[in-house]
């Protein structure tokens, strides 16, 4: 990004800087851990991130439950390809209509992965933060990781999703509106005593960064001043995998590798960031060679 534009954006967000949190010192985090995936703004890839992080941790032999907290607008079941197996949902559990084990959907592809779907015909006030925390405390006894897919916005759904969470993954894209919302969310997380927040920069395009048409990863980290846990390139394979209900984490795509590296960092491994500029240049070069034939 050109220097003047970058300086203007920095002033736009804040005059003072938030203190950066140190990276995890390579030590594995205490189990069980509850992670809320949030953003503030819709459409930045939060649900896709939740699906891939949950699936990746399950692939790494951790027992994982994904919880869709977006009551009334559930999507996580579709992204996971489990929409046809729903019998009970989150609201049924908190209202006592069923036990949580009856509502859990076991992913047949990954023996350690479960989904607790949201209700589609209720509103966000159907669940309170106290009820959500009580459910999470119960789930802690059985699962290594509990991943909460947070709805967009900062109202009741957000309050429910952060109740009982140990840390947050804040997902943003390199756009001013998305970063502005992420900045607000980080402040709200801190105000609610959720001090540990890690940043995922999604849909990064190095060709646009080089031309000054998109903020770089460093620009985004500089503005938000929280620990960067991963960057995911803009990849058409993400759209394909989402439409197919098959998370791509761990496959041979750049995005799949990026998501798996995020999962390993969550577990405390010291994994370097993918060199997206080098990889992108390599793949673009290959494409140009074959397209010219």
Residue ranges and their predicted role:
Residues 2-21, 26-28, 191-293:
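C-terminal lobe/tail of nucleotide-utilizing enzymes
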Residues 39, 68, 117-120, 150, ...:
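Flexible glycine-/small-residue-rich
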Residues 47-52, 179, 183, 214, ...:
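Short amphipathic alpha-helical segment that frequently serves as the phosphate-/nucleotide-binding helix
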Residues 69-141, 242-244, 249:
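P-loop/Walker-type NTP enzyme "switch/lid" segment
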Residues 34-98:
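Walker A/P-loop NTP-binding active-site region of P-loop NTPases
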Residues 2-44, 48, 58, 62, ...:
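Extreme N-terminal, non-catalytic leader segments
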Residues 63-65, 112, 144, 197:
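The start of beta-strands in P-loop NTPase/AAA+ ATPase cores
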Residues 130-134, 138-141, 145, 150-240:
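Conserved catalytic-core segment of NTP-binding enzymes
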């Amino acid at each position: 990004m050109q220097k003047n534009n970058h300086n203007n954006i920095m002033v736009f967000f804040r005059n003072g800087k938030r203190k950066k949190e140190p990276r995890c010192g390579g030590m594995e985090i205490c189990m069980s851990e509850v992670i809320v995936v949030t953003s503030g703004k819709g459409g930045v890839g939060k649900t896709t991130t939740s699906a891939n992080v949950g699936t990746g941790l399950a692939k790494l032999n951790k027992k994982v439950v994904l919880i869709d907290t977006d009551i009334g607008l559930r999507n996580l079941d579709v992204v996971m390809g489990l929409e046809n197996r729903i019998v009970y949902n989150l609201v049924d559990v908190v209202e006592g209509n069923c036990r949580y084990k009856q509502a859990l959907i076991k992913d047949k592809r990954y023996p350690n992965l479960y989904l607790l779907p949201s209700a589609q015909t209720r509103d966000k006030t159907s669940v309170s933060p106290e009820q959500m925390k009580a459910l999470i405390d119960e789930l802690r006894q059985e699962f290594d990781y509990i991943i909460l897919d947070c709805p967009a916005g900062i109202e009741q759904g957000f309050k429910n999703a952060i109740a009982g969470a140990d840390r947050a993954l804040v997902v943003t894209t390199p756009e001013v509106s998305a970063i502005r919302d992420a900045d607000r969310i980080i402040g709200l997380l801190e105000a609610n005593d959720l001090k540990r927040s890690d940043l995922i920069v999604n849909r990064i395009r190095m060709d646009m960064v080089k031309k000054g048409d998109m903020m770089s990863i460093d620009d985004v980290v500089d503005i938000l001043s929280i620990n960067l846990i991963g960057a995911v390139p803009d990849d058409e394979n993400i759209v394909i995998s989402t439409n197919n209900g098959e998370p791509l984490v761990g496959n041979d795509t750049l995005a799949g590798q990026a998501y798996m590296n995020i999962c390993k960092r969550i577990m405390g491994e010291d994994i370097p960031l993918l060199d997206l500029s080098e990889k992108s240049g390599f793949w673009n070069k290959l494409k140009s060679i074959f397209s010219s034939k």
